[in-house]
């Protein structure tokens, strides 16, 4: 910034990932934490609660929100009809079973006497996938006479830690209707198959299981394999590579359909299969596939067919501000970097003109309960510097701690995670107030406020359907409208910036400033 440049008034959007609101104190890591900064802000500034789940974010009624959906709604300023909902509707209407891309993958494999390998997160969590979609894809291929092999990635993160058995039994029952035509041939925890932080040693174990049947253990059935994993102290998320029955590996001429609909944790394994110049690890076998199909577009640079292309999204807040010549910053640590960039921009990979991105590496630990502060302090250092610089009209930051540590199910670590975020927010608050700026503090969905699952009796590692905080910090008092949703945040930010709201944004302004 030159001396002649007028310093910009900062407008900061803080996304406290996975921090929802729950009145009950029991098993509530947020209420157990010491949060003097947030308490002070709630005393001095207006605050409310908004919805981040179900139909309010374009998901089925009662479905918990997630980070991808949350950030897309936050950036879009409108409720977006999610891939989960689109695909479920197509299955219900029968359209899915005639889908050109999916049918082509099956028929191409059949034409060369190859098999169809279906892989994905076998879970009813509905965050990265849904088991009903996997069942439908198996039915599509089986009814067309294909040989079908299922490679099950187990959840235990968006579902209770030990909850995979009913899902495995559901698929076993389906395959029993088609004797000798298909079965579950492998399973592995999502910790290995669905990394998103370039931990290629994990992904390699999943890849070798699929391409070489290289396994830590073998079992005669999927349920037996699960029992062996539990006996070894592994929960679903961490189940080691398990071969089911006789060895089945992906062969030349086979097709693969990856049934995850959320992109971020599907990219790495997909790249291992389709990239010619892949360098994550040394591939012992590289099958020459008839087709590799991504259920949705995991990344624009991945050269593979896509069943459900993203719907065009115009005038997200990022695009709109860029077109007006405004400047913006997106900042997060690795675990949530894609969310404040790709997802917040409605599925756009590239920066907009006037946009700057800062990526802070997440700590290299096995699970984040070992370092619950993660990289929050480093994120805050960079954010405060950016606020002080006067360079940016809008600054968007994600604090990953509540969600990533909440997913571990470790209560004491989750408390420390919340306290780390609160400490950081105290610093951000001081920086914003010093610049007479505006700040909205909210969350994409809940998680850390419920750490025990009362139905299963297990620790609660998944998201919740609770409302999330909405706090306004600024130089004047204000009134916040009730009944807000995540899609209202972008129009509200534009209102604070004294900019007209584009017609595409159907959300409403939630903040009325006192004159």
From Swiss-Prot:
CDD domains in UniProt: iPGM
Pathway: Carbohydrate degradation; glycolysis; pyruvate from D-glyceraldehyde 3-phosphate: step 3/5
Catalytic residues (UniProt): 67
Biological-process GO terms, alphabetical: glucose catabolic process; glycolytic process
EC numbers for this chain: 5.4.2.12
Residues where substrate binds: 128, 157-158, 190, 196, 262-265, 336
Annotated Mn(2+) 1 binding sites: 403, 407, 463
Keyword Metal-binding: yes
Presence of the UniProt keyword Iron-sulfur in the record: no
Catalytic activity: (2R)-2-phosphoglycerate = (2R)-3-phosphoglycerate
Entry note: cofactor: Binds 2 manganese ions per subunit.
Pfam families per record: iPGM_N (PF06415), Metalloenzyme (PF01676)
One Gene Ontology cellular component annotation held by this UniProt entry: cytosol
Cofactor(s) needed by this chain: Mn(2+)
Record family assignment: Belongs to the BPG-independent phosphoglycerate mutase family.
Subunit structure: Monomer.
The protein's role, per its UniProt record: Catalyzes the interconversion of 2-phosphoglycerate and 3-phosphoglycerate.
Protein name, UniProt field: 2,3-bisphosphoglycerate-independent phosphoglycerate mutase
Gene that specifies this protein: gpmI
């Amino acid at each position: 910034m030159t001396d002649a440049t007028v310093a910009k008034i900062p407008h900061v959007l803080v996304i406290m990932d996975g921090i929802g609101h729950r009145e009950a104190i029991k098993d509530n890591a947020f209420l157990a934490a010491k949060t003097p900064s947030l308490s002070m802000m709630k005393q001095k500034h207006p605050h409310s609660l908004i919805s981040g789940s179900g139909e309010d974010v374009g998901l089925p009624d009662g479905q918990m929100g997630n980070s991808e959906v949350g950030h897309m709604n936050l950036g879009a300023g409108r409720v977006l009809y999610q891939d989960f909902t689109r695909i479920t509707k197509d299955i219900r209407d029968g359209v899915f079973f005639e889908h050109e891309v999916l049918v082509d993958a099956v028929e191409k494999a059949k034409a060369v006497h190859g098999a169809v390998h279906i892989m994905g997160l076998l879970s009813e969590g509905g965050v990265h996938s849904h088991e009903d979609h996997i069942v439908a894809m198996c039915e599509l291929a089986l009814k067309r006479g294909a040989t079908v092999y299922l490679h099950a990635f187990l959840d235990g993160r968006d579902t209770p830690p030990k909850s995979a058995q009913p899902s495995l039994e559901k698929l076993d029952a389906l395959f029993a209707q088609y004797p000798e035509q298909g079965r579950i041939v492998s399973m592995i925890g999502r910790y290995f198959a669905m990394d998103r932080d370039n931990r290629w040693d994990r992904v390699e174990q999943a890849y070798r299981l699929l391409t070489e049947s290289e396994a830590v253990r073998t079992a005669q059935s999927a349920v037996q394999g699960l029992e062996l994993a539990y006996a070894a102290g592994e929960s679903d998320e961490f189940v080691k590579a398990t071969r089911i029955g006789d060895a089945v590996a992906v062969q030349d001429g086979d097709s693969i359909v990856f049934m995850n609909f959320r992109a971020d944790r599907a990219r790495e394994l997909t790249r291992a299969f389709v990239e010619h110049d892949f360098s994550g690890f040394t591939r012992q076998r590289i099958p020459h596939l008839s087709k590799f199909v991504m259920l949705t577009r995991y990344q624009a640079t991945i050269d593979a067919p896509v069943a459900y292309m993203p719907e065009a999204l115009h005038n997200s807040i990022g695009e709109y501000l860029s077109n007006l010549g405004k400047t913006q910053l997106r900042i997060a640590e690795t675990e949530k970097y894609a969310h404040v960039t790709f997802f917040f921009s409605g599925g756009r990979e590239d920066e907009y003109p006037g946009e700057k991105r800062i990526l802070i590496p997440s700590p290299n630990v096995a699970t984040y309960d070992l370092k619950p502060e993660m990289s929050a302090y480093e994120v805050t250092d960079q954010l405060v510097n950016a606020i002080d610089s006067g360079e940016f009209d809008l600054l968007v930051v994600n604090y990953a701690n509540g969600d990533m540590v909440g997913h571990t199910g470790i209560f004491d670590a989750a408390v420390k995670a919340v306290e780390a975020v609160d400490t950081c927010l105290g610093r951000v608050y001081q920086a914003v107030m010093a610049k007479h700026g505006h700040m909205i503090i909210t969350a994409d969905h809940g998680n850390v406020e419920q750490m025990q699952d009362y139905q299963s009796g297990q620790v609660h590692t998944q998201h919740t359907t609770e409302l999330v905080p909405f706090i306004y910090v600024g130089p004047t008092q204000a009134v916040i409208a009730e009944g807000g949703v995540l899609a209202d945040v972008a129009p509200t930010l534009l209102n604070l910036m004294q900019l007209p709201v584009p017609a595409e944004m159907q959300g409403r302004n939630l903040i009325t400033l006192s004159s």
